[in-house]
Design a protein with these regions (language model features):
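His/Asp/Glu-enriched short active-site or ligand-binding loop at hydrolase and phosphoryl-transfer sites
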Residues: 94-140, 176-184
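Catalytic grooves of carbohydrate-active enzymes
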Residues: 134-183
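Structured helix-beta-strand junction loops
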Residues: 20-22, 106, 143-144, 175
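Alpha-helical elements of Rossmann-like donor-binding domains used by nucleotide-donor carbohydrate transfer enzymes
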Residues: 13-14, 71, 98, 132, ...
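Active-site beta->alpha N-cap acidic-glycine motif
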Residues: 1-60, 64, 68-86, 160, ...
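Acidic-and-aromatic substrate-binding clefts and catalytic sites of carbohydrate-active enzymes
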Residues: 1-10, 33-38, 87-97, 118-130, ...
Length: 184
């Protein structure tokens, strides 16, 4: 709802506060680059959601894909004085062995999430009310699962965070879960 991007200068204080609190951060690619398919000669085809090539499928070699992952690290360091952890997650969870290898050769470990860990906060509030999402995650998550949620999806009429996130943590702790930061 702010109309800006999370690595804009206006977010500097927010990210500095999160660093001081001890949070860990990874790359999700600078322009939210969706993997499409492997290319013909060791490259990959991907489509950025943002930036000057938004919506245009392009061919990325290892160097250009690495640049896309690393730009987040560089920008985060400009904002906070500290880099991110050397982890990344592909937008939409779309990958191939080649795209994961490209990230790895760039020095970043890919961290996906488990299907049960997709918390559904980007789905429509009308068809996926918060109680349904909470009940599903509370019952289906298993030991070692990695979850994923956006903390501010603009299309949900019934906000997911912080109310559902807090209750989910309470529910999972009630099942004996403990929590850790990545990478581990």
């Amino acid at each position: 709802s702010r109309g800006d991007f999370s690595l804009d200068d206006s977010w500097r204080t927010f990210w500095q506060d999160r660093v001081r609190e001890g949070h860990h951060f990874g790359s999700h690619t600078y322009d939210h680059l969706y993997f499409v398919k492997d290319g013909p000669s060791g490259e990959i085809f991907a489509r950025p959601q943002f930036g000057p090539k938004a919506g245009v499928m392009s061919l990325y070699n290892e160097a250009s894909y690495c640049r896309e992952i690393r730009r987040v690290d560089e920008r985060f360091k400009e904002l906070t004085g500290t880099g991110i952890q050397k982890i990344w997650r592909a937008p939409g969870g779309k990958t191939s062995p080649r795209s994961i290898r490209m990230g790895s050769q760039c020095g970043y470990q890919h961290i996906g999430w488990n299907p049960a860990g997709f918390l559904g906060d980007e789905l429509s509030s009308q068809t996926h009310p918060n109680k349904m999402l909470l009940d599903k995650a509370s019952s289906q998550l298993q030991d070692g699962d990695i979850t994923m949620a956006h903390l501010g999806i603009w299309s949900r009429k019934d906000p997911w965070a912080p109310a559902v996130l807090e209750q989910l943590i309470i529910n999972l702790k009630g099942r004996g879960f403990c929590f850790a930061t990545l990478p581990k």
